[in-house]
Amino acid sequence: MVNAVMDAIALLSSLASDLDIMLNDLRSAPSHAATATATATTTATVATATATTTANRQQQHHNHHNQQQMQSRQLHAHHWQSINNNKNNNISNKNNNNNNNNNNNINNNNNNNNHSAHPPCLIDIKLKSSRSAATKITHTTTANQLQQQQRRRVAPKPLPRPPRRTRPTGQKEVGPSEEDGDTDASDLANMTSPLSASAAATRINGLSPEVKKVQRLPLWNARNGNGSTTTHCHPTGVSVQRRLPIQSHQQRILNQRFHHQRMHHGTSEPIPSGVATPSSLDSASVDGGKSHTGNNNNINNNHNGQQSQKSQQQAGLAAKLNVLAQSNLNNNNTTNQPGSMTPASNRTGLDSNQNQKQNLNADSRRSSSVDPDADADDVVDAAHGGAFEDDMQALLPKCSRRSRDELSQSRTSLVSSSEGGILAEGETSSEDDEEEPVEAEDEGEESSRDSSDNSPPCDLGLMERLLVTHPMWFLPGIQRSGAVHLLQGKEEGTFIVRGSSQPNTMAVSVRLPQDTGPYIEHYLIQSHDNVLSLESSRFTFGSIPSLIAHYAQCCDELPVQLMLPRVLREANNRKKLSSLALLGQEFWSYVSSPALLGPLTPSVAPSKDQQLLDAKSPLSLTETSGLGTATFFSDTVSKPPPTGAPPLPGGGLFSPTGSGQLLGFFSQAGTPSDTTNSSLSSFTTSGGQHMQLLSPNSVDSVILTMSPVDNPGHYLPGSTGAPMAPLCPSVVDQQLSTFKVAQTAPEVDQVRPQRPKPPNTLNLKPPAPPLRWSKPHSPDQNGSANGNFTVTTTVTFSMENGGGGGSGPTVGNGNGKFVEVTTPAASNPFNALLNGQASTFQTFAKRLSPEGECKDTLSSQGSSSNDSRWPPPARKLLTSPMTPLTPSGGSSSSGGKSRKSRAGKESQHYKESDILESPPMQYCASALSDKISDYEDVWSHDPSDRASLLTSFRPALDTVGGVMNRRPDLLAETPSTPTPTQQSHLTPCEEETTATPNESSSQSLLQFSGDVPARSRAGLLLPNLSGQVPPVAMTKSMTAAEDDGGDTTPTAEGQANGASRSKQGSPFYAEPADALRQAGLTSAATAILRRQHRSQMLHASQRHSEPLKAGFGGSGNGAMLQPSDLEKLAGSLDELKPKPKVSQQQQQSQQQQQPTKRARNRIDHWQLDSSWEFMAKQDTGSHAGGDYDTAAIDWQEKENSLGRDSRADGQGKKRTLTIHQIIANRLPDLNLPELVRCSTPPQTAALQPHVLGQDKAGVGCDGSQKSFQSQIGCRLSSYDNVFCQNSFGGIDSAQSDDGTIFSEPWDSSQWDTFLPHDDATINSDTIHLSKCRPALSEDDTIVEELQSTKDGSNGSCNQDTLKANRNGAGHHKLNNGNGNGKANNRPKVATILRNPSMRDREVLCHPRNKMSIQSSGPGDSLRAYTLQLAQDPSSTFARNIENFICCTKESREAAPQVVMRNMRQFMSGMKNYLVKHGEGKFHAELETARARLKSDEFLNLDAMLETVMHQLVVLPLREHLYGIFVDHYQRSEDIQLLAQNVRYACEREAADFGIRPTVTPPSQAALRLIANLLWRLQEAELPLDKLELFLCVISTVFDATGCPRGQQLGADDFLPVLVYVVAKCGFVGAEIEAEFMWGLLQPTLLNGEPGYYLTALCSAVQVLKTFMASEGESGSGSLDWRSSCLPACSSVLRVIIPDECNGSLQTRTLPVRPHTTTREVCRIIAHKARITNPQDYALFKLVDGEETLLTDAECPQDARLAAKGKHCMLAYKRIDAKIAWPTAQLAGH
């Protein structure tokens, strides 16, 4: 029989390749097949077997019957031992070929009795597979072999195991027993064939081959001793015997019961091995490979008859069996027999030995090394001898086994506990675990902390510390932006080694100190021949840790020494470091840096009933992990319930899966089943009450779970010792905070700084951020009258040193700057949870930057959408920590430092949303506007302030019919009506606000500590705000002084600090509400600055928005026409949008709205403007009278919402920086004046009559035109038509009938007199009135071109037709009065302000620019949708824009031309993407727009999308690009050179600029107007706006020269004039502005006039740079423009153009930019010379009459200079033309 067994072994060894097919069938085999079926199968497959097989089957039936009888019997420990010893002897006997007769007898006895009770499915399949392989097998297998193989399927088919971290608690004992069965089948496959082991594990367990490859093969191959799997192994002997430790159903019940009882006891006694140590049973099943002790044999014989049922049952085993099994394992490892199965036995013993250690370490919960889900690190540890198997492997040297063991053991323990419960962190190392198991998590905080702190301190070297902690700082999977996120707010010198986009390189990102470089710098690590070094460094290293260690010890090449975070530096033992290393990347978001936490403060001394159970302090960092946070209870506070006691009601743990269903109830010691890979945030309350906040993988939010405590009264943080109502039905307003409340000051002496909980970075949606302005309420409010449980805690940790009374808890010294806020979205969350509803609790975790600014861990829109509509009874008033307190308030909640000092610490970076803490889809679920400052520092406004657009100093508004009844969703978190309970939470200042009964129901006031309406990174106004922004939203920045940093509000004490504070203590100067709503021209801060420049002649009591009183006309107006008054005349063409004439009745209605207002204002100032009522109606005051038609209203609102408002309001924190200001700031040595108008004298009085008259004429026609005074305030208001008619006329509105209610609509006599009646009145002094509509007097080329364009596009010269086209509506025409006819008769009437002629407007309404103006046409909806799409972060369009802006700002590219080229390419690419592929509903909107087009119209998508892309891309990068420009030209010293020459040229006369006497230079008045236009050009933000204004400048220059219409003013004359204008106006930023437009405008837009005049500007700048040198070289004191030897010729080209019609040569002077190519020059010439076939022409170089064709890429200037000294000319002629050039030199050549 034994020989037959060995023959079968030989046969099976030769069939290793066939076993892969057998195992494929194995997976599909039924695991619970009936015995009869299995028997039939066996009969069919072993037809050739002997009678012994039949007897075995009969015996199998008998054994199965016996097993059913014995399932309820619990065996004693010695039974189990005898089984193990017997099986060990079995192995020995078979391995040693019956060397011992005693063993042989035992083996024979086993043949009769030791049968398996389960169907022989496995052996049947294997035999059937063998036959299918066409191999004849004589089944002489003995009954023992059959039964041993059948025993492999003794257990039912194991259920698929859940993921390791999500297995329910109830299965945590069943799982290990089942997985052994799974693993054993894999063992079989691995022992049989090394190639099929992975597949076998996969087929049996359902896991991916990749997982098995990582977790199993390296371990097994390494542990076979020779590095390869033994190929002669077979599925008998050892592999069969190892199948023993399968638990029966009874044993599983026993395990669960014991585990449940153990959990309730909360003890550290080990579970009996027979119950919970399957790995030890595995060990026992294989030890004794060569055991011949008589004791074992006797025990086997005594219990031989009972072994047939022991393959499934496990009984209680004494703890000493573990020691015995361990000794047997050790003995087995040293007992090898040649020529036997001992190598496999030894391998198994090693596995079991490893299992024994890990099982003890994991608290007897699982067998890790043979478990399919064993931690890969354990496998790696065993396979590679402790080397790291991760991204470090190629870079790190082999490290010590000891430290890796601790790391792997600690990680194994933590992973194990995350399945069956969160362990206390204090796992002992592998050396200690052999003696005692780890304590469970319910041992209490102190016991668990002791377990981690008991490790003796040791001296850890830097290299060892780096190696152990490498999972934190070595993050090759992240890129630049991720590293920047992680290092925000960390210590100087903190670093992260990350991946790099360049091949064979990595990068180390370092947080640099101030004044040493950027906030975070990145240094490349290069690898050459396996040698590492920093880029361009002379130091080389063999590994990254050695490189880091070097730069951590010296500061040779880096500006700062590298260092680990403080927590890692101060860890004094390996155990703590290893535990911290488990956090990996989450460490950075998990642990606050010392820069934020400040010095560690001693722990809070717990009171009798108030234990500070804080698992988040830096002193206990190792008690938490990214896999789950361990939270503890103090035994002194709450005792565990009695053994076996059912869970208390209300202590249920609720599912965080989003469905809200109950998973079950657990006792206090129970830990949540972490079914969604969630991380636990913990709130430890003062009464020992434990609250866990699970961050679920659901859309909504955090589920609030509470574990019950013994005492029925639960102590809440807000309570002072009085027990509260029972937990579930409790109706309380409580503060959930990680801080201990300050009311317990007598009990709590000191507070330890807190540590925030990190959201899991895998599947979790991080908690939403809190409102930054919210502050804690008065803590004495523990109950409310309503029936809702509202946990609306808004806890702000004070950053100041002092604490204020009555302002909420003040913790410590203010160093712990972390806030966690829990807010509800359901009225009764606990009842909702118990009823299975999804609750929407949110945990707001906020991080503080080094400067003290709060940063949200996720955007505020990442929170649940359900919380956007809180029921008013469930709300608690969210008060503002910045709320100003009156002097009677007694104390300030912020205490300590002044607001100015705090504002100085404002961080501009990374206001919210750590990308690494958010899964991609969840991160993109929030709006684009929520990611305002992820990558940039342009806007300092905190995104959480978006929800508070009302300032705290605003008097309460009546919400009935008010604006708050229609407030947008972004204001949804604003409580609309504070209840009496809520009022008790107000700070003293707020209590004053709501003191009266009438105000008790008014709108609560929120602090708007950022700026006026928030703008996203793309510069967009937040949705729903443009038409609904309460007007007070702007008063903050209007009334705060500039030096306050835009982050403070004026207080009563500080209101006398400057004129920018509100008048008489009020922030309101009664600016019209509609002007505030549509403040789209400039920011409110600009308006404040301009207000300081108001005329000194005005009386102090004169309100800014009030019409001037009588007596201020005449000469007084001269003072009002100052540069500061004129500089903001109109924002753009859109701001001067034509509107219809206002009828007298409508004007009357407007006038009648303010009679009392006007009278009262003569006496005092309003505290609140009555015009707010129009804001409440979402209308302007004039809309109530209906004076504007619907299209005009729609246009204005849409324009404000889509771009104009956003471009201005987004700058709410500061004025738009101009290039002039940037240069003045960067180069203070230049001493540039604030407004460079050094040579402009005051405006003459002779100009004023025309100015005033024409302004009033424009008003008479339109009734809504802004006056100079109104534009000083930078606003568009319906009230402007009231006083702009008399602001400059000096007539009081009460006495005037000019355009007022006394005028009849048909009576034009009142305003006819102001219209000019002949062209003589049109001179250069009146051009400024047109601003964006200047008269055009250019050369005939442009005039004729524009005329043809006009005729072709509009069909007539009727200006109203064009206006209707611009407005996209046909009803925007003026009434057919005298004014209209006169306007048509005189194309250049002064009313071009509203009704410019075709000729006068066309240069600005260039076809390329019209679509940018025509925003109310068919393409308006498409434009609006595109902007909306850019705010949807889930769209590819928005994400690409965001990423591009981020990369551009982080790039170190120093060449502005390269940056602009990238921006231009990106904008073009995104336009193509939208048009070709579309996204969202773009194509649907496009089809809708197409349907609105007429048959002869088309929609210029390119122009429309161009304006959109400018807003989305150029606007956010504007100042960044300007900074690059200034740096670039500063390095080249071009700015200094230009400023020096401008200062010199400013004093020169017109003749010195080479202006011929026949050309009249611009007058001083014209220069003044041009200077204002140039200033407005610099303030314009977008290239198209700048281009419009620049064309205005050019047109104004032409008219200012007085050239008769149609007269040619060529480049020879125009360039000197332009140089003169630039010098006189001090336009130092001319070159940068020209380059800005050149680089960012679409190239096709620069064809024709825009490109020509931009080139002229560049040429003028080049001339100015060499002005002094050229003047000196000329010898005449003036520039000679026709001299070819002057340096100025580098910017001017003189080109000969032969006229083949008459045989003459024409000479043209062309302005050129430096290094202009031939192709560009040819394009300019073709345009100027009206060449219709430019492809037939080319530019030639004539040197001594010899023609040389210049290629397109050549530079004509260089070619000419290269021929200097010779007679060289440039000729533009037809390529095929044969021309004999004259030998006489032309003039000027």
UniProtKB/Swiss-Prot annotation:
One Gene Ontology biological process: regulation of Rab protein signal transduction
UniProt keyword list: Developmental protein, GTPase activation, SH2 domain
SMART domains, per database record: RA, SH2, VPS9
Location of the Ras-associating domain: 1689-1777
Bias kind Polar residues: ranges: 140-149, 223-233, 337-361, 857-868, 994-1006, 1048-1065
Source organism, top-level taxon: Eukaryota
Pfam families (UniProt xref): RA, RIN1, SH2, VPS9
Domain SH2: 473-566
Ranges of Pro residues composition bias in the record: 639-649
InterPro entries referenced in this protein's UniProt entry, alphabetically: RA_dom, SH2, SH2_dom_sf, VPS9, Vps9-like, VPS9_dom_sf
Biased composition (Basic and acidic residues): 903-914
Gene3D superfamilies linked to this entry: SH2 domain (3.30.505.10), VPS9 domain (1.20.1050.80)
Disulfide pattern: none
Regions that span the bilayer: none
UniProt entry tagged with the keyword Coiled coil: no
Tissues in which the UniProt entry reports expression: In late cellular blastoderm embryos, it is expressed in the posterior end. Then, as development proceeds, it is expressed in the developing midgut, amnioserosa and in a specific subset of CNS neurons. Isoform 1 is expressed earlier in developing midgut and amnioserosa, but is not expressed in the CNS.
Low complexity: compositionally biased ranges: 82-114, 295-317, 409-418, 671-686, 974-984, 1143-1154
Domain VPS9 residues, every copy: 1531-1673
GO cellular component: cell cortex; cytosol; endocytic vesicle
GO molecular function: GTPase activator activity; guanyl-nucleotide exchange factor activity; protein kinase binding; receptor tyrosine kinase binding; small GTPase binding
Compositionally skewed regions (Acidic residues) per UniProt: 176-185, 428-445
Function: Potential Ras effector protein. May function as a guanine nucleotide exchange (GEF), by exchanging bound GDP for free GTP.
Family the entry assigns: Belongs to the RIN (Ras interaction/interference) family.
Annotated protein name in UniProt: Protein sprint
Organism name: Drosophila melanogaster
Organism phylogeny: Eukaryota, Metazoa, Ecdysozoa, Arthropoda, Hexapoda
